[in-house]
């Protein structure tokens, strides 16, 4: 499918969405294919005025949407889920074109995104309240759950569809309306899903979207008293700023922020399984994943065996345009991402790390970087302290369980962690000791619509997905009834 064929599709939108209408602006910004540098769209560059219009539309639509029965909202959500699945092939190609990940991964993300809509279509019917024992005769105490109101969802470029539905699924299920601010690198994926939402029966004004002038959009959202909740996925630095600004109007906040995930391979681990898990986790989306491993800790007695197998496997990974057959590692999102990877690798090598695979820009040039394995890494290197967000596996040695737990926890972040062992006692000891919101034990994937997703320490606030996800979009109202 050519870029022109994508552009001619009804789901290809380049405006901003207010009250069910896609509007254009004279001022635009370019959306690029990270694999080729080609301009694939010029998108309306919204700012303060457009954002305020979007907020007003969401506020106006809120009373009617919250008044719908849970069953009615559930039916609309389920139809949205069906439409996403029906359009999986086209949506996957759109995502690969604007984001860069291999087509198979992109189609997998479409399914993953749809799973949140399907899940919350069911959870919409379970926003249950409570009857509390009365304190005196002739009285009742009831606790009800009600939608928080207008929600602002600010989503990242690395999972442009899944991060949208993980927020909008529970928001719509709860009875909230929303303003969506997708990342400027990847607005087209979000806009396509919102177009399908309207086809599914989401009323005009319930979902609105703006992209463009990030500071103006953010400032308008944070200043608004109509917006009662912010859900943000992105960097810890930006998240902290949003939390501070939210305090002025006491908005509820959900924050899914940065990580520095450890991956611990104990000497009793299944080494082949650990290598397979490492490849799947670290090099998915070219390492541009918030729960991607940042630090591999391998016990001294199995260190050489693990890193040699890992380096061999990494060398065999095919790099290229995600639309090409057999490609498993696509480009980084933009030149600044390449520069950060280069900076981390060069710093590590200067501090005595050994390049076991890759370690330099890919011959394809542009935003491509060779999948890399670095050995003999240690604390003090930039890649030990900062999230690399690229296809670099940094390997550290350790000797004892107590030592590696201390080193794994020696970070302000706590989003995800992983460890491989066949010792059941160690499973419980280490999982309790690791300071992380999610832990993979002999498992490289920690994200599903069924499980709570979120971090501790400076990696976030709140949980997304699961039965807990709906709670983030509800307020509790207590009714004290007398004279019965």
Model-derived features with residue positions:
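Hydrophobic face of amphipathic alpha-helices that form TPR/SEL1-like repeat modules
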Residues: 1-34
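Residue-level signal for inorganic ion chemistry
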Residues: 37, 73, 95, 117, ...
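Glycine-rich loop-to-alpha-helix module at the N-terminal edge of alpha/beta enzyme cores
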Residues: 38-127
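Conserved C-terminal structural/oligomerization subdomain of aldehyde/semialdehyde dehydrogenase
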Residues: 38-42, 227, 264, 318-319, ...
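Short, well-ordered beta-strand elements within core beta-sheets of diverse protein domains
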Residues: 40-46, 61-67, 153, 263-266, ...
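Generic secondary-structure signature for well-ordered alpha-helical cores
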Residues: 60-63, 67, 82-89, 100, ...
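Rossmann-like NAD(P) dinucleotide-binding subdomain of oxidoreductase/dehydrogenase enzymes
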Residues: 129-273, 398
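ALDH superfamily catalytic-core signature
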Residues: 237-378, 441, 483
């Amino acid at each position: 499918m050519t870029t022109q064929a994508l552009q001619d599709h009804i789901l290809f939108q380049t405006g901003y969405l207010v009250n069910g209408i896609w509007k254009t602006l004279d001022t635009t910004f370019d959306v690029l294919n990270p694999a080729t540098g080609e301009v694939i769209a010029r998108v309306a560059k919204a700012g303060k005025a457009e954002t305020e219009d979007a907020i007003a539309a969401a506020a106006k639509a809120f009373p009617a949407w919250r008044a719908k029965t849970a069953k009615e909202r559930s039916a609309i959500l389920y139809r949205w889920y069906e439409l996403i699945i029906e359009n999986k092939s086209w949506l996957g190609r759109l995502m690969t074109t604007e984001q860069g990940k291999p087509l198979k991964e992109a189609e997998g993300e479409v399914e993953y995104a749809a799973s949140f809509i399907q899940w919350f279509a069911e959870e919409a019917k379970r926003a249950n309240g409570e009857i509390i024992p009365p304190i005196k005769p002739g009285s009742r105490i009831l606790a009800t759950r009600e939608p928080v109101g207008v929600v602002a969802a600010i989503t990242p470029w690395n999972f442009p569809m899944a991060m949208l539905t993980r927020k909008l699924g529970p928001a719509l299920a709860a009875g909230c309306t929303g303003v969506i601010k997708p990342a400027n690198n990847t607005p087209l994926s979000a806009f396509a899903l919102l177009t399908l939402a309207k086809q599914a029966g989401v009323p005009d004004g319930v979902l609105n979207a703006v992209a463009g002038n990030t500071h103006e959009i953010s400032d308008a959202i944070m200043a608004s008293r109509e917006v009662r909740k912010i859900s943000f996925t992105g960097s810890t630095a930006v998240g902290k700023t949003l939390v501070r600004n939210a305090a002025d109007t006491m908005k509820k906040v959900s924050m899914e922020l940065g990580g520095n995930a450890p991956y611990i391979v104990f000497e009793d681990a299944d080494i082949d399984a650990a290598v397979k898990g490492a490849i799947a986790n670290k090099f998915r989306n070219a390492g541009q994943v918030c729960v991607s491993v940042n630090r591999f800790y391998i016990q001294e007695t199995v260190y050489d065996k693990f890193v040699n197998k890992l380096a061999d496997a990494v060398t065999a990974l095919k790099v290229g345009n995600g639309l090409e057959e057999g490609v498993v590692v696509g480009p980084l999102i933009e030149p600044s991402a390449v520069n950060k990877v280069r900076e981390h690798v060069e710093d590590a090598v200067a501090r005595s790390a050994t390049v076991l695979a890759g370690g330099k820009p890919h011959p394809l040039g542009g935003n491509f970087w060779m999948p890399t394995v670095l050995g003999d890494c240690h604390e003090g290197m930039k890649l030990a302290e900062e999230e690399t967000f690229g296809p670099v596996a940094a390997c550290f040695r350790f000797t004892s369980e107590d030592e590696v737990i201390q080193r794994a926890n020696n970070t302000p972040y706590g989003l995800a962690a992983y460890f491989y062992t066949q010792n059941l006692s160690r499973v419980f000891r280490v999982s309790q000791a690791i300071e992380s919101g999610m832990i993979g034990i002999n498992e490289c994937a920690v994200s599903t619509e069924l499980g709570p997703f979120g971090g501790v320490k400076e990696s976030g606030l709140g949980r997304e997905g699961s039965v807990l996800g709906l709670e983030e979009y509800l307020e509790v109202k207590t009714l004290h009834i007398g004279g019965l």
